[in-house]
Each structure stands twice: as C-alpha cells, then as structure tokens.
Amino acid sequence: PYSDLKRVQRWVYENILLKDLSSVSPCAEGFMPKDKDDIRNIVTNARRHARSKWLINVDIQDFFDSIKYDSVWEYFSKLGYEEEVVDVLTKICTYQFRLPQGAPTSPMLSNLIVRSMDDAFVELADKFNCIYSRYADDITLSGNSDSIMPSMRDIYQIVYAHHFRPNKK
C-alpha cells in the first residue's frame, strides 16, 4: 500500500485490532505480536505436535485473497461501529474486495476473521482427541491414537464451510 494508506492501516492495527487480541483463537500461532507472556510463532506451533504419532497438515489456498470484503465488514460491524465507520474501515483494510498481502492489517484481521473456523477445528480435534493449531494458512492436526483420526473429508468440509479452499498440490 501507499505510505499514507499504510500509516492509516498501522493506526487501525494498533488502535483497533490489537485491542481485540483476546478474540484471536489460542490455537492461532501465526501473525501474533511479540508478548513475553504469550509467545506464539512457528516454533511454538511445531512444539504442539512434536510428540504425536501422526500429523495432518493442510495449506489453505490463497488465504488472504479468500477473505472477502463482506467478512471484513462483518468483523468491524460486530465491534459496534456505526455503518459509515464500518464502511470506511473496511475500505481501508481491503483492496479489490479482498484482504491484500502486505497490508499491516491483513495478518491480524485474518486471525480475527477465521476464529469461527478455528473453533470448528477445535471441536473436531476434541471429537478425535487430537491437537489442532493454525500457523497463518497452515492447518495442523495431530494425535497419538493409531486408529482414530479425522478424515480428510472432515477437514475439507470445515475448510469449505468457511469459504476457503485447501491447496491440494
């Protein structure tokens, strides 16, 4: 984004999105600000699954591009802003009706917007007594049972239900 737009996006990130950090799923390991009390990164993501016998990893195709204007609008609306403010915030944070790569707001918005998908995966993980985490666009489930694990169909069903596509390459 242009430098003036980027400055405004940083303001939105620091003054709106970071104040809603508690709404990010505890299973989201990517795009988290550094915090000595709650360190979440690619290493902590891998550690969650290190002792598991099996592991399933699914990459979401075109992650930011898949998060549309309407989802961003809905997120800001839920924060209680008036419609005009929601419109402006959404326009500041999207480009061509999607979350743009490289915008300071996109990573945190993605974490906040996909909370319902994270919750659905936590439910699936609980059902199969396994571990779930998401690092940015990478979904990981792991466990120790030799016979019980979620099927790819179960996983894809959640991905598709939240308007994403798995990268099957």
For each feature predicted by the language model, list its residue ranges:
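Conserved polymerase palm-domain catalytic core
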Residues: 47-136, 140-169
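Active-site-proximal segment of RNA-dependent polymerases
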Residues: 5-57
